[in-house]
């Protein structure tokens, strides 16, 4: 009898196993989380059954899956993996919508989905660009993995050095730009060799992993001065928050570094009240340079970023962000004299805490910043050439309020304290001479107020004013501005004008090079832009600009030149003086298409002239970063759910060789006219291929990139050696990167 019962049980189980399994259907829509546009050619996978579907032209998909709790995963190249949990009833149909976030960040439900394609960081700024995470990933470069390299391809941005992150906008130098992180001006965001005049062998790279960035914005001129103390463009980084959905891990290997990003919910997962994000990056750039550069300079870096975010209440949020990094440059000992630069060390740390309180009609934000930096440059013999230490502490408070539907006001105040010490010495014969030695501290305080008023639906006015005080010189400054936008159908006309001022730094005021009564630098911006929308996904923009500058700094007598037929060497003791007056004028043309399912990119051309006059000697010359013609082109096309191709092209007429140089019969000599000789024009085309492979909860992305596809020989300025008898300047230009293939990969768990 037991045997008979066992046989009957086995037969019943066999019959049950042959019964059809209950199934249901999932009908869904996949959207771009930023624009709300349907996404075509997206792979949607049911993790349990391995059933998959690909979205059509309308972004929709359908699949038949076993009933019960199902976990879907949407994957397409250029977007973060997106999980979706659904419950499928037997014989039922479930409707789902899956929004995808471009780049590396996960979709946040708090983000408002709109139909607008083009984002704005400052609604009234005539010329601006915002790069999201997806474009940063494609433009940063596999070789360098640097978000500032992504900015270099934006309209109006000029750069002529493959090895440096710094760039110029409308002739303005990097030191005159606002470089911000999470709303604070942050000067320590570069891995670089500091305080070295001979930058021929040096390079730089941003001290932040591109994978942790939410976006980066560029405002070329005429922007709202929430921070102030800069006369040029504004570049702002925003670090994304970690995933509140589940723990995630990303491991990447690029052409120069390896990195890991871990993130996940903070607190109970079901509550979704907070998140954490940790990133670490280690370079092996020195191995690459060893193969590409003849003198085998070694440059390495490491950095880490942390961001914690927590909702204290439904209306209050706290954030804490930390960046730390260090870099090391080592020149080959066999090619150096005992007094030459052999070792350059640089280390920085920045911490930012923020609190945000959102009310029905108002927003209140408070923030704290602390930053430290130290650097040291040593000779082969172990003598310090440069030794510097800097500290920064800041606090700021911002508030905004919607008074009426047509009137919005905002204001804020900040106090920043700085401490800086610097010692510099240079070899003189067999000994060293102290060139500069100072230590000081100062406080900068400022406040601003701004409004946005729309008297009619088609017109918006945005006036504002900022007041600043700098205790180092005892100077105060008032900086007003006004923006206006007029919309007529698909056409927008934006104009802006304002006064932008920058106080002198410690080196300009104290120490051997400083002048105690040096004035602040001032610039008046005048911008006018006309933008024409072409449907929902394209636009054309033309901008004309004029930046009038006065009281800009110069070290007269610091450069070697020919005077009355005699070679006059530059003085190492020359002091800073505010004696330059000049202008930067030009026009920028820009076409952009932003389409999630087709070709995206832009074409831009900028023509500019940047010239100065010394108000004491009446000497007139082109600015160091004057570039007459600038072409920047970028294109991206998604071939399938797994494959995309992109390319970027930068062409520039290039900058002057800074100093008094001239050319005669193919040779270069010290001359009588400053910035009369220019670096040869540059052109560089880079191509990139992305390919993804998806397995359930994991994805592998392979990157392949070729830098300088056309193998064009480009050059940068190199401080030359000068023959005192013939005045010849030898090795004035230095060759940059040839054609370089590179590859990388990214694991996502």
Question: Which residues does each predicted region cover?
Answer:
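Structural signature of Gram-negative outer-membrane beta-barrels, strongest in the C-terminal barrel
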Residues: 321-323, 400-410, 414, 435-550, ...
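Periplasmic N-terminal accessory/gating domains of Gram-negative outer-membrane beta-barrel systems
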Residues: 80, 87-95, 109-224, 234-241, ...
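Transmembrane beta-barrel wall of Gram-negative outer-membrane proteins
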Residues: 254-282, 294-328, 342-365, 401-407, ...
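Gram-negative outer-membrane beta-barrel transporters
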Residues: 456-461, 546-548, 570-661
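Surface-exposed extracellular loop regions of Gram-negative outer-membrane beta-barrel proteins
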Residues: 185, 190, 196, 421-428, ...
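Outer membrane beta-barrel strand-and-loop segments of large Gram-negative receptors
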Residues: 392-398, 436-448, 519, 525, ...
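Periplasm-facing N-terminal accessory domains of Gram-negative outer-membrane beta-barrel systems
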Residues: 10-116, 121-122, 453, 486
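C-terminal beta-signal and adjacent terminal beta-strands/loops
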Residues: 642, 651-665, 690-749
């Amino acid at each position: 009898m037991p045997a008979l019962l066992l046989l009957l049980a086995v037969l019943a189980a066999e019959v049950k196993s042959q019964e059809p399994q209950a199934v249901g259907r999932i009908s869904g829509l996949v959207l771009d989380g930023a624009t709300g546009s349907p996404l075509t050619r997206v792979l949607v996978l049911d993790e349990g059954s391995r059933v998959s579907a690909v979205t059509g032209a309308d972004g929709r998909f359908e699949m038949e899956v076993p009933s019960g709790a199902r976990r879907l995963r949407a994957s397409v190249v250029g977007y973060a993996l997106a999980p979706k949990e659904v419950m499928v009833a037997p014989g039922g149909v479930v409707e789902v919508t899956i929004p995808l976030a471009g780049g590396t960040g996960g979709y946040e439900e708090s983000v408002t989905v709109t139909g607008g394609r083009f984002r704005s960081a400052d609604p009234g700024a005539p010329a601006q660009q915002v790069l999201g995470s997806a474009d940063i990933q494609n433009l940063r470069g596999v070789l360098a993995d640097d978000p500032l390299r992504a900015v270099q391809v934006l309209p109006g941005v000029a750069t002529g050095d493959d090895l440096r992150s710094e760039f110029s906008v409308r002739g303005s130098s990097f030191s005159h730009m606002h470089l911000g992180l999470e709303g604070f001006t942050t000067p320590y965001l570069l891995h670089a060799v500091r305080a070295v005049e001979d930058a021929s062998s040096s390079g730089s790279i941003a001290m932040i992993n591109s994978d942790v960035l939410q976006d980066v914005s560029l405002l070329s001129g005429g922007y709202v001065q929430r921070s102030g103390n800069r006369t040029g463009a504004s570049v702002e980084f925003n670090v994304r928050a970690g995933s509140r959905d589940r723990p995630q891990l990303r491991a990447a290997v690029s052409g120069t570094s390896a990195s890991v990003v871990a993130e996940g919910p903070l607190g109970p997962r079901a509550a979704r009240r907070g998140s954490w994000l940790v990133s670490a990056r280690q370079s092996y750039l020195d191995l690459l340079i060893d193969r590409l550069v003849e003198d085998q300079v070694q440059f390495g870096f490491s950095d880490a970023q942390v961001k914690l975010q927590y909702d204290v209440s439904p209306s209050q949020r706290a954030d804490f962000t930390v960046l730390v990094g260090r870099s090391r440059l080592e020149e080959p000992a066999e090619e150096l004299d005992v007094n030459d630069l052999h070792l350059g060390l640089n280390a920085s740390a920045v911490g930012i805490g923020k609190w945000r309180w959102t009310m029905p009609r108002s927003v209140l934000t408070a923030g704290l910043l602390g930053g430290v930096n130290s650097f040291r440059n040593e000779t082969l013999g172990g003598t310090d050439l440069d030794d510097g230490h800097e500290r920064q502490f800041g606090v700021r408070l911002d508030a905004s309020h919607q008074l009426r539907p047509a009137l919005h006001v905002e204001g804020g105040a900040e106090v920043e304290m700085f401490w800086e010490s610097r010692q510099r010495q240079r070899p003189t014969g067999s000994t060293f001479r102290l060139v500069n030695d100072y230590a000081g501290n100062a406080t900068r305080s400022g406040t601003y107020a701004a409004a946005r008023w729309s008297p009619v639906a088609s017109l918006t006015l945005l006036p504002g004013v900022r007041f600043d005080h700098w205790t180092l010189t005892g100077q105060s400054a008032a900086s007003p501005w006004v923006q206006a936008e007029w919309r007529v159908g698909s056409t927008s006309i934006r104009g802006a004008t304002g006064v932008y001022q920058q106080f002198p730094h410690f080196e300009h005021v104290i120490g051997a090079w400083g002048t105690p009564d040096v004035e602040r630098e001032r610039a008046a911006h005048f911008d006018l832009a006309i933008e024409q929308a072409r449907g929902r996904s394209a636009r054309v923009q033309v901008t004309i600009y004029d930046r009038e500058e006065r009281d800009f700094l110069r070290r007269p007598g610091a450069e070697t030149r020919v005077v009355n037929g005699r070679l006059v060497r530059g003085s190492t003791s020359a002091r800073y003086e505010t004696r330059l007056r000049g202008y930067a004028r030009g026009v920028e043309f820009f076409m952009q298409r932003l389409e999630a399912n087709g070709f995206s990119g832009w074409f831009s051309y900028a023509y500019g002239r940047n010239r100065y006059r010394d108000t004491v000697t009446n000497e007139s010359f082109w600015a160091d970063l004057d570039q007459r013609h600038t072409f920047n082109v970028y294109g991206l096309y998604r071939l399938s759910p797994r494959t995309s191709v992109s390319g970027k092209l930068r062409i520039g007429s290039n900058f002057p060789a800074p100093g008094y140089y001239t050319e005669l019969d193919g040779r270069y000599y010290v001359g009588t006219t400053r910035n009369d000789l220019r670096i040869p024009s540059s052109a560089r085309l880079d191509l990139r291929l992305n390919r993804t492979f998806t397995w359930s909860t994991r994805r592998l992305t392979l990157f392949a990139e070729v830098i300088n596809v056309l193998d064009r020989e480009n050059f940068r300025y190199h401080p030359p050696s000068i023959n005192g008898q013939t005045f010849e300047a030898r090795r004035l230009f230095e060759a940059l990167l040839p054609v370089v293939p590179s590859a990388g990969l990214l694991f996502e768990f």
